[in-house]
Amino acid sequence: ASLVFGFGRFALHERRETNCMELTEPQIQRYSRQILLGEVGGKGQMKLRQAKVLLIGAGGLGSPAGLYLAAAGVGTIGLVDGDVVDLSNLQRQILHSTATVGMPKVESGKKTLTAINPEITVNTYHQLVDTDNILPLLKDYDVVLDGSDNFSTRFLVNDACFFAKKTLISASMFRFEGQLTTIKP
């Protein structure tokens, strides 16, 4: 579309077609490749902007997930992790860098995510998930993405999402194999 009549005219057309006057010109430019997709469009981009995703774990799985959520324009991302960045994390936990070694992973993650997209909100929770805090953590989010690295946390998050009626996306990795499942209430 942009080759035929220019991106500026496309953006104006997209704005009119989807009634998404809430998107600014810079936002339309930032998300233009998503807006071009019929499955997303301007309305879908507005939904992403209003979405709230809680990311449990800012390590090997949470790192790429967080990067893509921020780049896609998810409006609010919550990061939950009680760990700090270690040098041994850096080859697989791409949310972090040498400069953030020793920093809480949630703070390192926030720094990276807001550098990618300064328009999003990143809430940080430097804590481990437990029976006392899981339900309060979930309450303000639409979707929970579990990238934790142990079964007890996974079971707890699954149970909490069930009782709180939250959509759960659960991912795990072992060596070169991965699994992903989505559970809707």
Predicted regions: what they are:
Residues 2, 6-7, 20-185:
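Adenine nucleotide-associated cytosolic modules
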Residues 11-14:
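Short hydrophobic alpha-helical segments enriched in small aliphatic residues
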